């Protein structure tokens, strides 16, 4: 798992180059947003249970067939597994926010997830929608916590959505 800084260093080291203007700007941007990234992680941590609960509620309101008999979140065990997975996505998105890199998502979330879900018969579409809903809720929470610019929060959620969505359908 790498953060934005170690990823940048690795790329320039492999090329045998000094940092150019683009690299310096990337580093500057990462460090300037560092305080907001940490504040975001703190706010997400303090509200994680509520974020997951709201995400699940909204997802099941939008797609009630998931919790009806025969639905993928029908039964207490499956419902709990869905919420557990949402919590998992939130936790790793938070790591990616702080790191400023999506490497942790590739290494710990996305590798093998699609195959696992397919083998268990878990539909990817509602998972992707749940991640999108979660992003919206997180951004609302961060706005309420006084974090004005939350654009950096989009990246991990959009990345998971894109990676899961592209490869399943």
Curated annotation (Swiss-Prot):
Keywords, ordered alphabetically: Antenna complex, Bile pigment, Chromophore, Electron transport, Membrane, Methylation, Photosynthesis, Phycobilisome, Thylakoid, Transport
Question: Could you name the domain of life of the organism this protein comes from?
Answer: Bacteria
Does the record bear Membrane in its keywords? yes
Keyword Electron transport in the entry? The reply is yes
Q: Which residues carry this modification: N4-methylasparagine?
A: 72
Q: Where does (2R,3E)-phycocyanobilin bind?
A: 82
Q: Which InterPro entries match?
A: Allophycocyanin_b (IPR006245), Globin-like_sf (IPR009050), Phycobilisome_asu/bsu (IPR012128), Phycobilisome_asu/bsu_sf (IPR038719)
Q: Where in the cell is it found?
A: Cellular thylakoid membrane
Q: Which GO terms describe its cellular component?
A: phycobilisome; plasma membrane-derived thylakoid membrane
- What is the membrane topology noted in the UniProt record heading this document? Peripheral membrane protein
Specify where it is mainly localized: membrane
Pfam families assigned: Phycobilisome
Family as reported in the entry's similarity comment: Belongs to the phycobiliprotein family.
Describe its function: Light-harvesting photosynthetic bile pigment-protein from the phycobiliprotein complex. This is a protein functionally equivalent to, but with weaker absorbance than, allophycocyanin beta chain.
Against PANTHER family, the record matches this protein to: ALLOPHYCOCYANIN BETA CHAIN, PHYCOBILISOME 32.1 KDA LINKER POLYPEPTIDE, PHYCOCYANIN-ASSOCIATED, ROD 2-RELATED
- By what name is this protein known? Phycobiliprotein beta chain
Species, as recorded: Mastigocladus laminosus (Fischerella sp.)
- Higher taxonomy: Bacteria, Bacillati, Cyanobacteriota, Cyanophyceae, Nostocales
Please name the gene that encodes this protein. apcD
